[in-house]
A protein has these predicted regions:
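Interdomain/boundary linker segments immediately adjacent to catalytic/signaling cores
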Residues: 1-57
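Amphipathic alpha-helical segments that form well-ordered structural scaffolds
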Residues: 57-66
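A short acidic/basic microdomain associated with nuclease active sites
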Residues: 66-84
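Short loop/turn segments at secondary-structure transitions that flank enzyme active sites
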Residues: 69, 97, 117-120
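Charged, often glycine-rich, active-site loop that binds/positions anionic groups
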Residues: 83-95
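Conserved catalytic cores of phosphodiester-cleaving nucleases, focusing on short active-site segments
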Residues: 91-93, 110-116
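Short, solvent-exposed loop/turn segments that connect beta-strands within catalytic domains
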Residues: 98-107
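Acidic, metal/cofactor-coordinating or nucleic-acid-engaging core segments within structured domains
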Residues: 120-182
Length: 182
């Protein structure tokens, strides 16, 4: 359980940043996480945002560890507010066909719309995710560019460059798959 919780937490903040940020704010690590990083049950939007975050992280893990996509982890990190979700395509993953990562038409990008629910009585998240995934064609380019910039800000220059490859589909075609999860 501890390893899984640590994995989830690292989607929000890196170890070294957590220690520094907690110290600068005069807080324990646990207090800093509760007050500044992880959405909490007793806060407005906290349960909804946390449910969405966890569902997105699980989908990221599925794409990365089961289907072998590279999945940028940027959405939960350094938010302007812990209960503020990023807009756009929920999860993107990519694969390069060529080991040198030279663009080919066999490269793959998967754009996934994710929906979560907080109650047992609502069983329609997948239907909502499928409906929302149809909007992704219009917002995917903005999401890829935002992801590229966020990765660069987070110091992940290599992955930022890899993601940029998927910006200009007409110039560098690739296989694109839209998916939904809920």
């Amino acid at each position: 359980f501890d390893e899984w919780a640590l994995h989830i937490r690292r989607n929000y903040i890196e170890d070294e940043d957590l220690l520094i940020d907690a110290e600068i704010n005069g807080m324990s690590v646990e207090q800093y996480l509760r007050e500044y990083v992880i959405p909490q049950r007793d806060e407005t939007l906290g349960p909804t945002v946390r449910s969405g975050d966890i569902t997105e992280i699980i989908v990221c893990d599925l794409l990365e560890f089961i289907f072998n996509y590279s999945v940028p982890r940027y959405k939960q990190k350094n938010r302007s507010g812990k209960n503020n979700s990023e807009h756009g395509t929920d999860v993107i993953g990519y694969k390069f066909f060529d080991k040198s990562k030279k663009p080919t038409e066999k490269d793959e990008l998967i754009a996934t719309e994710v929906k979560a629910v907080l109650t047992r009585s609502d069983y329609s998240p997948l239907e909502k995710a499928i409906a929302e995934s149809k909007k992704d064609e219009q917002r995917l380019a903005r999401t890829i560019d935002y992801c590229r910039k966020r990765l660069k800000e987070l110091g992940n220059i290599e992955q930022s460059s890899e993601v940029a490859r998927f910006l200009l589909k007409p110039d560098n075609n690739y296989k694109l798959t839209y998916a939904a999860a809920g």
